[in-house]
Amino acid sequence: GTGRAGEAAARSFVSIELGLDIAQCNFRTREGEIDIIAKSGVEYIFFEVKTRTNKKFGSGVEQISARKALRLQTTGQRYLEQIGAENADWRIDLLSVEMDKTGRVQKVTHVENAIEEQS
C-alpha cells in the first residue's frame, strides 16, 4: 500500500538527503514500533513516518501526538537497551511523505523534535 512506498521514500530521504546511517527499520516491541532508527554522530533519531495521498487533511505539517510520542519514547528506550546504549542521546523526528493519486512521492518533509506540546 501507500505506507510501504512512503517508508521506502522516507528511508532514501534519511540516507541520501540527511546523510544519516540507518541503524534499523520497523523496530517493534510490545509498546509500539519505530519506522526508522538512524544515527547522527552520537545521537539516535527515531523517525515516525506519515504518508498521505492528498492535501485534504490539512497541508500544515502534522505533529506527533503526546500519547504516540510516549509510545515511541518507550520503544526507543527498549532499542537503546538492546544495543547497550541506554544512556545515548536521542530525539523523535517526523517524516511526512506526500504522494499523488498514482502513488508517486511528491515531497518529503522533515520535522525535528516533532512532538506536540502538551497543553
How should these model regions be labeled?
Residues 1-24:
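Acidic-basic catalytic patches of nuclease active cores, encompassing PD-(D/E)XK
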Residues 36-57, 72:
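Conserved catalytic cores of phosphodiester-cleaving nucleases, focusing on short active-site segments
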Residues 82-119:
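Domain-level recognition of nuclease-like catalytic cores that cleave nucleotide substrates
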Residues 27, 49-51, 113:
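Active-site donor-binding loop signature of nucleotide-sugar glycosyltransferases
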Residues 14, 72, 92:
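Residue-level signal for inorganic ion chemistry
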Residues 18-46:
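Active-site metal-binding core of divalent-cation-utilizing nuclease and nuclease-like domains
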Residues 31, 53-55, 98, 117:
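Feature marks short, surface-exposed loop/turn motifs that line or immediately flank catalytic pockets
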Residues 57-88:
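Mid-chain, well-packed structural core segment of small domains
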